Amino acid sequence: EAHTCGHDFHAAMLLTAAKILKENESMLSGRVRFMFQPAEETFEGAKDMLAHGVLEGVDAALAYHVGSGRMPVGLFMYNSGGTMMYSVDGFRITIHGRGAHGAYPHSSIDPINIGVHVYLALESLIAREADPGKACVLTIGNFSAGSAPNIIPDTAVLQGTLRTNDSASREKLVRRLKEVALKTAEVFGGMAQVEMISEVPPLVCDPAMTDEMVSYMEELPIPGLTPVPDTSASASEDFATIAERVPSVFMYLSAGYMDERGDAPAHNPKVQFNEDVCPIGSACLAHCAVRWLEEHQ
């Protein structure tokens, strides 16, 4: 399996920024910590690093993520006034019923039937209980049960994600997701267990610091370096747990192509990221670190 999200680019850019800053250490008005965040794809890496003290003595944080698509290298996307990326609450719902032969469904408690009703009820959460003025996305990406066509199994499993762009919607919908799954299973005589696999808040950047970082990047004489404000994505990023604790900025750097090489999205096996973004990202990271320390001695 491959994550195909550009994390090799992130590591290369940060390593190069570290090399630049180490070679020019006398220019630094403070200390810089380099965070190589693991397990972003499972939303566990930042939490583990926090538990091991990654923010001890840290006053601010800056993170970049490359983006694919039909767009030129040099765009940098940010949000200084709202949610940059949505929350994500991954969940696993295990439905327990009673298996039976397919010829005698009346002697079973069919977990597949229960699962179908749970699925439909959860979809109704977004349609009828989510504030239409807020952005909420619920996806069931896995529904598995049984191994034979003529046997009703004992269990069924649904796995998915709930994403929102504000904390109030998140709190309400996570609570209702659990209630709907448990009560729907009870209605049909079964039982449900709900496990929350990932719990990541919305990523909200510090407005003043974001404006600062944009101004520092605009100081660099890099051809095509272009700001794209008010960016918001329904994807999620556990850097949000860092941003909850210290003033933070998260930006997307375009690593796309303006031809067919930009057609495949991230997480697609055919995605291509443009390596021309690497020196841009390294230069911006290093310069922003130097300038922020100068201004905040």
Where are these regions (language model features)?
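DPxDG-like acidic metal-binding loop motif
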Residues: 11-18
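Basic side chains
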Residues: 19-22, 33, 163, 170
